[in-house]
């Protein structure tokens, strides 16, 4: 289902450039050390919480964050502010699984471990859910790459689960110079896409009960169902190592920027082309991957694949997506998209480590993207990902319209608020 939505978006977006036109706040005490647009402030809700990945904020303000590694005997950290000062004074850990996906739905806390989606019953007034859990979906194979299971609810009883591909480009020998791509790629049967399940049915199996909603997505850690438009969106982590494996086709500079991190409007039946294709934001087109005979310019079979609605520079790690529906922030942010970029590891100039904003009109971007929250890395220039002080990973919206950001480096959660001058 080829849709040339990308062509509607202004060219500046495709080049991955942005213009920070808003004046930034210059009062570190009011922004908890972050750089934010004028009028916004930040406070630290909790810190040293563990490797916090994604999070949800309940209607009463309680926060639930998934953990990549167990801490204090649990894979979920629960926070409550009982004094009203904005800071969590109660922090509890629970859960038998670690992972990334987390969500609140119909009185349950859902959790995405690497091989199973489970849910815990919430009790009114209680911070910690019931300890027993039920399996919603399982049968996911255990892998050593892109094993996380982030998910989104559509509000109509369905849950959409990312099943990342355990490979770079589906080569006969993964991440090996000279190894050809498998054609057809056998991984696509149960990986490299988004599967849909019933959000309420128990003990579903990926291959028996799941529905492959979209394919050709290498790994989408950031997904969100846009309730206003009734559409699923995702951001893909693009493939790696073009220059390392194909130095005759790609310079180091090209490999730094390519391929794009793709912002996807995911429809039923979408095919975004991985592993056969990638999106080149400089040429503004899908390009045939070198493992499948591409030369960095040829489109070939990729002409039939779906394009992104927006393309970001390569290797900056989009790890969460949130469409803002609150009333606290100025009107320009209403129904626009916030994206948390985890930061790069495989480029000579490290980029990302920030949260950006994309304005929307209807189902597509309506203008240039801009950096919304910055300063997480702790320095304007870092040599590698390990030097970053914080790495943004999760986003959530509070009942008052505040934006929450968590990092998985030091386990810090920030609350971003806005007050008219």
Segment roles from a protein language model:
Residues 90, 99, 105, 115-154, ...:
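Asp-box/WD-like beta-propeller blade repeats and closely related beta-sheet repeat scaffolds
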Residues 14-16:
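C-terminal motif of bacterial Sec signal peptides marking the signal peptidase cleavage site
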Residues 396-421:
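Blade-level signature of beta-propeller repeat domains, shared across WD40, Kelch, NHL, RCC1
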Residues 43-68, 317-323, 339-340:
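Beta-strand-rich domains and repeat architectures in extracellular enzymes and scaffolds
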Residues 57-61, 104-106, 153-156, 224-229, ...:
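Residue-level detector of Asp-centered blade-edge/turn motifs that repeat once per structural unit
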Residues 22-38, 148, 165-208, 216-219, ...:
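Beta-propeller domain segments
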Residues 62-66, 108-111, 158-162, 231-235, ...:
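Conserved beta-propeller blade signature
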Residues 45-49, 92-97, 136-143, 211-216, ...:
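Surface loop/turn motifs at the tips and blade-to-blade linkers of beta-strand repeat domains
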């Amino acid at each position: 289902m080829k849709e040339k939505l990308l062509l509607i978006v202004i060219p500046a977006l495709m080049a991955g450039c942005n213009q920070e036109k808003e004046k930034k706040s210059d009062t570190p005490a009011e922004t908890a050390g972050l750089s934010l647009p004028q009028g916004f402030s930040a406070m630290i809700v909790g810190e040293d919480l563990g490797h916090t990945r994604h999070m949800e904020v309940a209607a009463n303000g309680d926060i639930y964050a998934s953990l990549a590694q167990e801490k204090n005997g649990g894979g979920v950290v629960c926070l409550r502010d009982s004094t009203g000062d904005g800071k969590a004074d109660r922090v509890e850990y629970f859960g038998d699984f670690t992972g990334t996906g987390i969500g609140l739905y119909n009185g349950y806390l859902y959790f995405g471990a690497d091989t199973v989606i489970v849910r815990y019953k919430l009790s009114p007034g209680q911070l910690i859910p019931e300890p027993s859990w039920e399996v919603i979906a399982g049968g996911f194979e255990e892998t050593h790459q892109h094993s996380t299971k982030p998910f989104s609810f559509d509000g109509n009883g369905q849950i959409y689960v990312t099943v990342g591909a355990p490979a770079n480009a589906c080569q006969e020998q993964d991440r090996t110079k000279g190894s050809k791509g498998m054609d057809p790629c056998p991984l696509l049967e149960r990986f490299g896409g988004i599967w849909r399940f019933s959000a309420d049915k128990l003990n579903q199996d990926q291959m028996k009960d799941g529905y492959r909603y979209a394919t050709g997505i290498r790994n989408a850690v950031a997904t969100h169902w846009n309730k206003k438009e009734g559409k699923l969106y995702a951001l893909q982590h693009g493939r790696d190592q073009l220059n390392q494996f194909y130095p005759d086709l790609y310079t180091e500079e090209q490999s730094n920027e390519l391929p794009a991190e793709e912002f996807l409007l995911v429809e039923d039946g979408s095919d975004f082309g991985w592993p056969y294709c990638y999106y080149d934001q400089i040429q503004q087109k899908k390009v045939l991957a070198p493992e499948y005979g591409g030369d960095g310019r040829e489109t070939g079979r990729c002409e039939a694949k779906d394009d992104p609605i927006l393309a970001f520079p390569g290797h900056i790690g989009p790890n969460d997506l949130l469409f803002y529906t609150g009333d606290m922030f100025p009107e320009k942010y209403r129904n626009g998209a916030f994206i948390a970029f985890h930061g790069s590891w495989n480029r000579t100039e490290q980029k990302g480590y920030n949260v950006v904003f994309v304005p929307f009109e209807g189902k597509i971007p309506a203008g240039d993207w801009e950096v919304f929250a910055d300063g997480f890395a702790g320095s304007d220039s870092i040599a590698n990902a390990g030097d970053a002080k914080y790495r943004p990973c999760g986003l959530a919206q509070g009942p008052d319209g505040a934006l929450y950001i968590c990092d998985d480096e030091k386990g810090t959660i920030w609350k971003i608020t806005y007050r008219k001058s």
